[in-house]
Amino acid sequence: RPSFNLTDDEKELRKDIVVEALKYKGVGYLYGGSSPFGFDCSGFVQFVYEKFGINLPRTVKEMEKKGTWVKRQDLIAGDLVIFHNPRHVGIYASKGRFVHASTSRGVVRDKLDSEYYQKRFVGGKNIISSLSF
């Protein structure tokens, strides 16, 4: 899924989503939170995507039903990254890194290949390419 197959508009949107997500680094974790006062993982992803008029469900389980599955090696900026045990979601940034609301650290950027996340990674979800450009 090379990014050079994307339209300029889609590339721009994906980049903008990641830039927006990174603006909230340092915001604390709040169970059930979906605002800059505090986020849980799905509330954070839903909030960021909503800034671009993209409506996502509130839970990771429901987000998993949207878009198309993407293999780890095919992830591109703006894709969702899904984890199990426990269920968790973040936004893929680039170069093996993703942005998410961590229960212990709030909104941070982490490496997908860290032992903790590597063991729990289920797949990516491409939500954006299903939109019309």
Question: What annotation goes with each model-predicted range?
Answer:
Residues 23, 27-77, 129:
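Catalytic cysteine-centered active-site loop
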Residues 77-78, 87-89:
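Short, surface-exposed beta-edge/turn micro-motifs
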Residues 2-12, 54, 60-62, 69-70, ...:
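Aromatic- and glycine-rich peptidoglycan recognition patches
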